[in-house]
Curated annotation (Swiss-Prot):
The keyword RNA-binding does not apply. Homohexamer. GO terms for cellular component: cytoplasm. A divalent metal cation 2 binds at residues 64, 215, 219. It comes from the Bacteria. A divalent metal cation 1 binds at residues 63, 101, 219. Pfam families: DUF34_NIF3 (PF01784). GO terms for molecular function: metal ion binding. Belongs to the GTP cyclohydrolase I type 2/NIF3 family. InterPro entries: DUF34/NIF3, DUF34/NIF3_sf. The lineage of its organism: Bacteria, Pseudomonadati, Pseudomonadota, Gammaproteobacteria, Enterobacterales. This is GTP cyclohydrolase 1 type 2 homolog. It comes from Buchnera aphidicola subsp. Baizongia pistaciae (strain Bp).
Length: 247
């Protein structure tokens, strides 16, 4: 497949042109024109790049790319090494960030809802869906379910709450700031990737169950879903590689 054609296909599938993002979505570094083998992962870290090189990959697709609005516009240190490795091996680097968070089927949030069997009822923000469990469950049972499904013991806070979990809002990745919008929707639980100090106070004072399942763990299933879609739809030689991250 042509490298620019692959970019167009995924841009169309994820409706990338609809969003203003903090990164350039699509092809971030141009490599060889013809792509036969692709490696995918959550983040364009050196470990993933090295594995792509050792696997003779022509392309890398990630959720977290190399270029961000808030990053210095200077290429040095680890970023120089990453970019040099990609260019020296004529590899195409693609990244889809927000579009892969919010896609209604392949997106990270959609995947979380599907995995936890949450019936989506609406959206508090475009990246913050809310929904209902079929039956209320205890917080310890939700923790066990998350551990089983995401292979990660979640951080949980809800020491002052006696009611069970039923109505949940969630946001993949670094979504803890969105807890501020939760109370007015009558949600009893908020789940996201990361946690901040002030998150605990807000959850406590609003009597909310709070779960942090890990940034990486909350965003692993979107890129896996995109990988599977490309493999089935276009018969590509494409494989996901998990570079585990405890955060």
């Amino acid at each position: 497949m042509n490298n620019f054609e692959l970019e167009k296909i995924v841009n169309k599938k994820l409706n990338s042109n609809q969003y203003n993002d903090v990164i350039p979505n699509g092809l971030q570094i141009e490599g060889r024109p013809k792509i036969k083998k692709i490696v995918t992962g959550v983040t364009a870290c050196q470990l993933l790049i090295d594995l792509a090189i050792s696997n003779n990959a022509h392309g890398i697709i990630v959720h977290h790319g190399l270029f961000w609005d808030n990053h210095p516009k200077i290429i040095k240190g680890i970023y120089r090494h990453r970019i040099k490795s990609i260019l020296a091996n004529n590899i195409n680097l693609y990244s889809w960030h927000f579009p892969l968070d919010v896609h209604p089927i392949l997106g990270n949030n959609a995947q979380i809802g599907h995995i936890l069997n949450i019936n989506v009822r609406g959206y508090i923000k475009s990246c913050v869906p809310w929904g209902m469990l079929k039956e209320p469950i205890k917080s310890k049972d939700m923790s066990q379910l998350i551990t089983q499904k995401f292979h990660r013991v979640p951080f949980y806070y809800g020491n002052n709450i006696t009611q069970n979990i039923h109505k949940i809002a969630w946001c993949s990745g670094k979504g803890q700031k969105f807890i501020n919008f939760i109370p007015e929707y009558g949600v009893d639980t908020f789940l996201t990737g990361e946690v901040s100090e002030e998150t605990i106070h807000f959850a406590h004072e609003n009597k909310l169950h709070f779960f942090s399942i890990g940034h990486h763990a909350s965003e692993i299933n979107g890129i896996k879903a995109l990988t599977n879609w490309l493999k089935i739809k276009f018969s590509l030689d494409i494989n996901f590689i998990n570079i585990d991250n405890p955060i």
